[in-house]
Amino acid sequence: MSKVRVYEYAKEHQVSSKKVIEALKDLGIEVANHMSTINENALRQLDNAVDGTNKKAEAPKKETTSNENGNSKGPNKPNMTNSNEKSNKPNKPAGQATKPATANKSQGAKPATNKPANTSNQTQSSGNQQQAGGQKRNNNSNRPGGGNSNRPGGNNRPNRGGNFNNKGRNTKKKGKLNHSTVPPTPPKPKELPEKIVFSESLTVAELAKKLYREPSELIKKLFMLGVVATINQSLDKDAIELICDDYGVQVEEEIKVDVTDLDVYFENELNETVDESKLVERPPVVTIMGHVDHGKTTLLDSLRNTKVTLGEAGGITQHIGAYQLEIHDKKITFLDTPGHAAFTAMRARGAQITDITILVVAADDGVMPQTIEAINHAKAAGMPIIVAVNKIDKPQANPDRVMQELTEYELVPEAWGGDTIFAPISAKFGEGLENLLDMILLVSEVEELKANPNRRAIGSVIEAELDKGRGPVATLLVQDGTLNIGDPIVVGNTFGRVRAMVNDLGRRVKKVGPSTPVEITGLNDVPQAGDRFVVFEDEKTARNIGETRASRALVAQRSATNRVSLDNLFEHMKAGEMKEVNVIIKADVQGSVEALAASLRKIDVEGVNVKIIHTAVGAINESDITLAAASNAIVIGFNVRPTAQAREAAENESVDIRLHRVIYKAIDEIEAAMKGMLDPEFQEKIIGQAQVRQTINVSKVGTIAGCYVTDGKITRDSGVRIIRDGIVVFEGEIATLKRFKDDAKEVAKGYECGITVQNFNDIKEDDVIEAYVMEEIERK
């Protein structure tokens, strides 16, 4: 029989191997370590010693158990005829433990039914050898993996013989099966937020994440609300508000600000509330407008000379297109060329670069077309107007007539009860200039023009050029803040750092305040007139914004729409870019203008109308070209010619100018261009016939028809029909046309040729090959 090792015995009795070794030494049995084996005699002695100790420890507990149950009987023990059977633990009832530790452990186990073991009966009737064998088997049954009833989930019946391993496995499986698994509690959904913030749009998944809900739940709600959406589909503002309203959650849309948009900084300046104590009075910015030869340039020259006589010695060369004039310790800023592109571009963008407009009207000429145009420009910009009645020194001057004519355009003099200031002057002789300057200062005081000099500068570009020695040079007008040397700046689509600044006197300055013109260098490229500039905190930010704006401008330039002309009008209409044709009419007399306009308005082709945006009498000037470029219009001139400046501007702006001397030709040209929108009509034309006289089959080529041209001619690029007994059997194109072995472009009547037809080899002798072309016919 096998022997038991020390550690196995210790494990069965739930004691340490050290205590077992000490107990064996007390019995006089020497063991080396926990791996040593214990023979049967030593094992019997050790069991007797352990039983004696356990009985002393269990005696009080057993009495307590008997008293509690009201039973005076002792513990239930099987009848033993042999003293050696007292140490046989499996012969006791399965529910009773042999040691306190085991008893405590078995108390939590499920109670089992006590059954007599067949092995015990066999052991009682057997000899000493069988009893010893039973003792050994029972000891093995208490080892780990056996069917010991003292272990949780174990089998209460004693094991039989050598089947204890299988019993142990079954017992463990039963323990696992009997163990009840509690399902995990599903997590509680988070509480809905009080408010969510979004910008532009959200997908269903993003909205579900913000609401702490599953996307499937939102998809169901959206479907019930009439919105069909998938998990990755973007929801607009209405759908987001709809679903959040259903949940009772507030919605707030966050508007993202494009930091590369310079207009945002100007809007913030207008909207932000500034401490009045930080604002200081700034000089007014004045521009001069009027009709040709009414004295605008003379007035500017006179004002320059006045500046020289007032404070400067000698003649001063003007370096930039704007200058300042000081009178009564107050400054006035004048734009040198009020009609140039900078003013037009700024007015179109709504930029309030100028504060006051001086309208120059000749006293001997009165109100002219450009005068009316200047009035409309000033009103569109919302600027106050001061009327300077010039040339009062001439004998035929009549200022009252000028006042009377201007009342028709809501410019009523103060002397007549209106609110428009009229200042009679003589720019040539310098009369009335000081009074005009005083009126400008008076209007500026009424307007309360103020700015904050303690902020970073913003403003607009008056003009710019590329200087050979200094590189890109830009003339800026500071509208608010203070511009310093070294400031990182973004000007339109360019950027840089201000290296040098030169004022209108040609002197270098270190800083300039509001309403001051200055010429700067240090940009990476030449900006456009009318661009805005903004000073930033650091050069890195300015560079990033400038490069982003430049790249966007390049993309926009590549995808820009070409100007409309009569030649490409149909392409624009077909692409859906236009639904009407904008036209500017200029003629020699008003009657021709009205007749031409009335005739053009009657043209209606496929729902596309002619829209006349401007009519006037006189030559085509630069203002007409500017308007045509802004509105994508075509300029029609009747008995008039464009000026040299207008022709140059038209070339630069790609504006189409059409000149006519006969009115119906102008009408026909516009109508013909509009009819180009209709699909062209084609008509078939038979150009020749050929009779097939012989066919030759060639591998990799197909069937070659040897033909004789009986009528007209056969061309290489014509379409053909194969006619057999008067029936068309195939229609296609010629693949090859040869005369002898050479390729031919065409074969005339009376000549022989070889023809192969694309995708057709079933050519028979006596077939007729008919050649035709499609010709476009003119619409009527």
From Swiss-Prot:
Domain tr-type G: start-end pairs: 281-450
Family annotation (InterPro entries): EF-G-like_DII (IPR053905), IF2_II (IPR044145), IF2_N (IPR006847), P-loop_NTPase (IPR027417), Small_GTP-bd (IPR005225), T_Tr_GTP-bd_dom (IPR000795), TF_IF2_bacterial-like (IPR000178), TIF_IF2 (IPR015760)
Residue segments, region G4: 390-393
Top-rank taxon: Bacteria
Chain residue ranges for the region called Disordered: 44-194
Feature: compositional bias, Low complexity: 82-93, 117-168
Binding site for GTP: 290-297, 336-340, 390-393
Chain spans, region G5: 426-428
Gene3D superfamilies, per the entry: 1.10.10.2480, P-loop containing nucleotide triphosphate hydrolases, Translation factors, Translation initiation factor IF- 2, domain 3
PANTHER family attached to this UniProt entry: TR-TYPE G DOMAIN-CONTAINING PROTEIN, TRANSLATION INITIATION FACTOR IF-2-RELATED
Function field: One of the essential components for the initiation of protein synthesis. Protects formylmethionyl-tRNA from spontaneous hydrolysis and promotes its binding to the 30S ribosomal subunits. Also involved in the hydrolysis of GTP during the formation of the 70S ribosomal complex.
Protein name according to UniProt: Translation initiation factor IF-2
Species whose genome carries this gene: Listeria welshimeri serovar 6b (strain ATCC 35897 / DSM 20650 / CCUG 15529 / CIP 8149 / NCTC 11857 / SLCC 5334 / V8)
